[in-house]
Design a protein with these regions (language model features):
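Zinc-dependent metallopeptidase catalytic helix centered on the HExxH motif
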Residues: 141-160
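Catalytic cores of alpha/beta
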Residues: 135
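Flexible glycine/serine/alanine-rich "lid" or loop that lines and gates the nucleotide-sugar donor pocket
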Residues: 140-141, 245
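N-terminal organellar transit peptides
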Residues: 1-124, 128-131, 146-148, 161-320
Length: 320
């Protein structure tokens, strides 16, 4: 029994230590300033070299939240606003490769894109490896949605949070934990108290509210009746072919052909350049630490884990 207790305590200590290390490294990293820069070095921030103007390509990748290794909300919103006000910018082409993220940030991007369109400019969206949940939510702001034939999309639904009841485990290893609080539902989701039926109902109500918002976004932007959109909104992932058959996207094609279509149908084949924008974060101390300690590719894996584990719910997120 004593050995079992010691093992349990050791596990908790290890988990706590890893969480503290990742949290500290993440805190160091998020102080990096947001940058607006083209993908290719030879592309300078000179938007008047083509008198006819340019199409802006914005890459949206990684988990959608305030900021992480590959995503920065402030950068994205400010870039969209800047492009709206730039007379040389004629349209926006989104490259979306994300499993989604928080409801707040996903909706903020959607609204920023809708505001961009008030200038009379068009938006086309191209879905990469995955454009699910919040990624699809953002796609709905586009006038046309294209996808690669191997794209996974859809996952129209909401996660309001996860409850972990550790009271039995703590009791077995001899640890007592109590949170002093006022208000019977103030301590929801704390590991030291089980979730009550009333609390589950509260969270389900929040979840349902954001779900209806998502369904309405799909219905409005995909020219569907609400009932039709809801029938497609059970949280499942769709292949590109399934999404096309169900009216969730407009075409399965390449990025290059989407740009060609954009120029043909929106600008009568005008010779517009395509200027690329993506959030680029410097290789940081935590990246170096992870690569040295755990091997190549580990920094990306740890970032994905930390981004999702620190997610602020509710979320439009496909988790697989």
């Amino acid at each position: 029994m004593k050995k079992q207790k010691n093992s349990g305590i050791l596990v908790l200590i290890i988990i706590a230590a890893i969480s503290l290390i990742l949290g500290a490294l993440n805190f160091i990293d998020i102080k990096q300033p947001a940058k607006i820069q083209p993908v290719h070095k030879e592309m300078k921030l000179n938007f008047n070299r083509n008198k006819k103007g340019y199409i802006a390509k914005i890459t949206i990748e990684g988990v959608i939240q305030e900021r992480n290794r590959s995503y920065n909300q402030e950068w994205l919103i400010s870039t969209i606003k800047m492009l709206k006000d730039d007379p040389s910018n004629k349209a926006l082409a989104l490259f979306i490769d994300t499993p989604g993220g928080t409801v707040y940030e996903a909706d903020e991007v959607y609204l920023a894109l809708q505001n961009y369109k008030t200038s009379g400019k068009k938006i086309y969206a191209y879905q990469g490896h995955i454009a699910a949940s919040g990624g699809y939510y953002i796609s709905c702001a586009a006038d046309k949605i294209y996808a690669n034939r191997n794209t996974l999309t859809g996952s129209i639904g909401v996660i309001s949070g996860s409850s972990f009841d550790m009271t039995e485990l703590l009791s077995k290893i001899g640890i007592k934990s109590k949170t002093i609080h006022a208000g019977k539902n103030k301590n929801m989701f704390n590991y030291n108290e089980p979730l009550t039926a009333e609390q589950e109902k509260i969270m389900q109500g929040i979840c349902d509210s954001y779900y209806e918002q998502f369904v309405n976004i799909v219905a409005q932007n995909r020219n569907m009746k609400n009932a039709e959109a809801k029938a497609l909104s059970d949280g499942r992932i769709y292949t590109a072919k399934q999404a096309l058959d169900n009216g969730l996207i407009d075409s399965i094609d390449s990025w290059e052909n989407m740009i060609a279509d954009m120029k043909k149908f929106e600008f009568e084949n005008a010779n517009l350049s395509v200027e690329e924008f993506s959030y680029k974060k410097d290789f940081t101390f935590s990246d170096i630490f992870m690569e040295k300690a755990f091997g190549t590719g580990s920094s990306e894996a740890f970032e994905k884990f930390f981004s999702e584990s620190s997610m602020k719910y509710p979320a439009y997120l496909a988790d697989f």
